[in-house]
């Protein structure tokens, strides 16, 4: 089959026509999408009808509980450091401790709420009940799949599985599908066109599946979606945004759309995508963590988000008119990386939709929503660098006029997530510096296994209390997730049983601890690069299993390994007990090359799967749509 003929329309669009004469785009139905002002605007509806009862008390619990626990821990830390006065370094340590402890405490408080929601079946809203028969739909929804230099075979295999799953619901006539390409390289464009034409031929769906490739991909993904809204959005009451690796069941899609129909003041409903398809050790570890820890985290944030939920950019249904009226993103003033197009657009779009008077919700209990994770730590960190820039860019948006205070909180949490990495690093360096510059401290005296030895008048008991309480707050979400899983017999068995789940959690915790210093270092570097004005660019994501050569690993992590050895040697010079306390960080940095290499292997992931480690229900009992995706991808492999 020949490639598609192209007819230039205007300055920025290419409408394409199959050589059989079948148009690949429907008639246009324009919908105005004005650019929103960040300097003017007001919150249209302060309290939403669909907000849960007692939402103010929920938020008071989160913020008040975080502040109370943080103040208690800070007071104890101050008491530990107070005898003899506090010097500049100790003051820095106290401030860093206060902010970091508050950070982990807020996560703990949210996870605790999520635990009770999971165990006792709370958090259901918007009338969505997965157990009742499917409701009948009365409106039209467009499924949008933006793509940029993705493998079209993988992409359209997922789309075909979704199409077939929707057909099984008997309500396919309420949906159209759009593949929205921003690919710049011609080989990708031609491959997309060939696979699209073949898909339409297989399904007989020329009038339901459409393809558009932009000649000018201004605005990246956000611009891609906005272009579709302005050209075709008027024909659809809802749009469902999918990533290139997203898969959803027809049942889940119909229930989400039905919830939009029955709640006319709701502008966005975010599902909880389950991470699937991983084969490397790293990918399987990540998807196991998302499966076991993800529910209590998602239920927790949904519990206090209420009708001001966040948006993750995919696997969510959006009211098209609400999006068009309120989510047109302006270009930010100034140079990149802080100026230009909004990178992490999803947070901002949700905030603007909420400012416009529409509710935004998350429904973590609705199953049948899937995505894939990066295959290696390297791939995750490449993507994370772009997210870092996008979140720090929100510093220019968080003060925008009229935003709900919870929307501002979402952005501040995103910014804080990346600043915690250099703060942890500074905490470690200050901890080394204190005994080095301490007045009258004999570095050769004693072998006490406690940092209390380095501060005059301090007791081991107080320091160990702080350490124990901090570790409890850090690890409690994992323990709560394990206990919550024990209350769910099907999920417990599908994950390999209680013992294998516990072993998996222990192994995941060890591997995560070894990789944490790598993440800390590279996130810190990313923050400093953004602050120095370095742009992240826009590259295609790695979806298949990554293959990392030793030369690439040494180039990426060799310097970090040397730094880890130097820090370890310095700590040992100060005191062997201090080196012992710092060993988790030092070992993670020093052995970063073999750790990343080991976790990037498919063979290790396969062996652990045979042993029942890191199992998830989607591996032991995959849904029909996931089975179909795997079949289609195998069939399209050369």
From Swiss-Prot:
Broad enzyme group: transferase
GO biological process terms on file: glucan biosynthetic process
Location in the cell: Cell inner membrane
Source superkingdom: Bacteria
Tagged with keyword Cell membrane: yes
Record keywords: Cell inner membrane, Cell membrane, Glycosyltransferase, Membrane, Transferase, Transmembrane, Transmembrane helix
InterPro entries listed in its UniProt record: Glucans_biosynth_gluTrFase_H, Glyco_trans_2-like, Glycosyltr_2/OpgH_subfam, Nucleotide-diphossugar_trans
Transmembrane region(s): 60-82, 97-119, 415-437, 464-486, 499-521, 578-600
Coiled coil stretches, renumbered: none
Gene Ontology terms, MF aspect: hexosyltransferase activity
Pfam families according to UniProt: Glyco_trans_2_3
EC number: 2.4.1.-
Membrane topology (UniProt): Multi-pass membrane protein
Keyword Cell inner membrane found: yes
CDD domains: Glucan_BSP_MdoH
Entry-linked Gene3D superfamilies: Spore Coat Polysaccharide Biosynthesis Protein SpsA, Chain A
Pathways involved: Glycan metabolism; osmoregulated periplasmic glucan (OPG) biosynthesis
Gene Ontology cellular component terms for the protein in this record: plasma membrane
Entry function: Involved in the biosynthesis of osmoregulated periplasmic glucans (OPGs).
Family: Belongs to the glycosyltransferase 2 family. OpgH subfamily.
Protein name: Glucans biosynthesis glucosyltransferase H
Organism: Xylella fastidiosa (strain 9a5c)
Lineage of the organism: Bacteria, Pseudomonadati, Pseudomonadota, Gammaproteobacteria, Lysobacterales
Gene: opgH
